[in-house]
Amino acid sequence: IMAESMKGLKRTHRCGELSASQAGQTVTIMGWVQKNRNKGGLVFVDVRDRSGVIQVVFEEGKADAALLEKAAKLRAEYVVAITGRVEMRSGAVNENLATGEIEIIPESLRILSESETPPFPIEENSKTKEEVRLKYRYLDLRRPDLQRNLRMKSHVMTLTRQFFAGEGFLEVETPMLGKTTPEGARDYLVPSRVH
């Protein structure tokens, strides 16, 4: 499967922002495939983005054969764009998901990027060794607990900046007060006549 173009695509909603109030609407979501369960003629795909997870249901009779076949080939961490109709779940509500009372019935599926099997599961409270998580930091940052930490840090930093700006402070970044970069970049010297 080749990666498909994003030309003409625009996300209308984030996965975790969907709710029963959007039932009947056509939406476009983009995200990573978290799980793919193929029940033969019925494929359940959980799609995750930074806001949460939504279930997409590819069903024989509702989706054409090519779409069903494409969905069956999806693997963990593939990046996809899906356009479909939001519907109330016909089966049991999933209490573990904020979007557990709805699902998307797809009209189109685009695979934006394929992925090899990740070295560890992208899930909360992963039991993976820290050494492996740090080696694949770009994957580790997709985990829900780290996403929460990043959002909290961003929120605190924004509030702090707003407070000090409101008090008339000016934010200044100077080379002498900045952090050093341990990735091999050399610190640059600033000539000074003081020393």
Predicted segment positions?
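Class II aminoacyl-tRNA synthetase catalytic cores and aaRS-like
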Residues: I1-H195
